[in-house]
Design a protein with these regions (language model features):
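Short acidic-hydrophobic, aromatic-tinged amphipathic segments that line or gate anion-handling sites
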Residues: 103-112
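Amphipathic alpha-helical interaction surfaces in cytosolic regulatory modules
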Residues: 34-104
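A charged, well-structured terminal subsegment
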Residues: 111-121
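STAS-typified acidic loop motif
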Residues: 2-45, 61
Length: 121
């Protein structure tokens, strides 16, 4: 079992990161733009080095993101299965407009993401 990792003390970026079953869940928080994406990129790189399974990004506390996040998710997807939970109308629209909704699946819970991503992986 891999350990939980805390990031950013609840600020913008990755506020929590931990293994849940056979997936790793990273909670993103705040307004992710150029000023804060490096936090997400570094946290993801750490997880990719330490954990062999799928990554699930929890977006429930994300108030803004731009195409940098979509690019990051697609880059991560080339290395591991990726799923999203806690999307909102803004995120759903961003995925639709960028044509990435089909390759970045959304789920109702970490458990649903785990079931689908471990079956697909």
């Amino acid at each position: 079992m891999y350990s939980q990792r805390q990031h950013d003390g609840g600020g913008t970026g990755v506020s929590a990161s931990a293994q849940r079953g056979s997936v790793w869940v990273m909670e993103l928080r705040g307004e992710l733009d150029l000023a804060f994406m490096d936090r997400v990129e570094h946290a993801t790189a750490d997880v990719l080095r330490l954990f062999p399974g799928p990554l699930v990004y929890d977006l429930r506390h994300l108030s803004f993101a731009d195409s940098l996040l979509v690019n990051h998710l697609l880059t991560t997807r080339r290395q591991r299965p990726v799923g999203l939970i806690g999307t909102n109308r803004f995120v759903d629209r961003m995925l639709e407009v960028t044509g990435t909704a089909e390759v970045l699946p959304t789920f109702a819970s970490p458990e649903a993401a785990e079931a689908a991503l471990t079956r697909a992986g």
